[in-house]
Amino acid sequence: MSDEREVAEAATGEDASSPPPKTEAASDPQHPAASEGAAAAAASPPLLRCLVLTGFGGYDKVKLQSRPAAPPAPGPGQLTLRLRACGLNFADLMARQGLYDRLPPLPVTPGMEGAGVVIAVGEGVSDRKAGDRVMVLNRSGMWQEEVTVPSVQTFLIPEAMTFEEAAALLVNYITAYMVLFDFGNLQPGHSVLVHMAAGGVGMAAVQLCRTVENVTVFGTASASKHEALKENGVTHPIDYHTTDYVDEIKKISPKGVDIVMDPLGGSDTAKGYNLLKPMGKVVTYGMANLLTGPKRNLMALARTWWNQFSVTALQLLQANRAVCGFHLGYLDGEVELVSGVVARLLALYNQGHIKPHIDSVWPFEKVADAMKQMQEKKNVGKVLLVPGPEKEN
């Protein structure tokens, strides 16, 4: 992961949003020294901005820094991209608190996905060229203006897809697809519980459920988001703040559900398991219950660990149920597997069956606000970061 290390190590530590020093005297012939200084400044390379995680803790641990731009020099099998949009994921929030095990050593540029334009192609790359619009799935390092990545981790963006939609697609939709279809074996007539149904993965999962006939979707979210959930395809929105989702589901479906998508962990995994019908599956793909505030909460860690679900093979056999675990970060070497899923997702997009729902778009300068938007669960859909100017949300 040399790209991330180079970005972090070369960062100047200066906020790129600060105005440059004024040089009014540079045009004054009576001040030759000032003129020479201005000329030297003009000849210096431009700066590229990046976000750097400098330590574990609150929102202030992610700093906007800059590094001198250099001519792109991708190695064999690599591409250099100019990024236009980057995805923010729950794993990035956990990484900031030191809770994500796939993060390279600090300081590091976070970010697992983005979309942009190819500006240079390395030796041996024949299926990409300068000017191509691509989206990228990477272990980290995507929150910067330019990045060099392996070509096999990039995917061509469909003509009708925007950069923002492309930056919102990969992590959320790959996760939702593989949980529902590869693990869950979603079939017509099935019922699915989608936790955090207004989040990026949740919205993606609900759209994918709509591609299968007669699927009933139970979706948990705060009451203010229920209208958006219904518009996206949730059959039965449930306000987890005021009701017990287990009781609500049992009222409608006494036998339970076929698939539980569990990003929560802790005691909620056990609840999901007990909601399963015979031949049902709970697929756990996150530990959102660990995050209770901007900084790491040791009590939440202890509580979630203590309540971690455990089941024996004999119990699974007797119940005719399955428990599965999914972690996209550990599939970074499974190029063919992931590429096949992306191909199916792009086909669904081109057919009009799925479309990433963008909650908000934030400039790099407001990364703290973007993280807060997601961590406080105010978002409906995907939260994005962009190197360019702020957009109205």
Swiss-Prot record:
Induction: Increased expression in glioblastomas and on wounding, in basal keratinocytes. This expression is calcium ion-dependent. It is found in: Cytoplasm; Mitochondrion outer membrane. One of its GO terms (biological process) is negative regulation of mitochondrial fusion. PROSITE patterns: QOR_ZETA_CRYSTAL. GO terms for cellular component: azurophil granule lumen; extracellular exosome; extracellular region; membrane; mitochondrial outer membrane. Possesses ATPase activity. Plays a part in calcium-regulated keratinocyte activation in epidermal repair mechanisms. Has no effect on cell proliferation. Negatively regulates mitochondrial fusion in cooperation with mitofusin proteins (MFN1-2). This is Synaptic vesicle membrane protein VAT-1 homolog. It comes from Homo sapiens (Human).
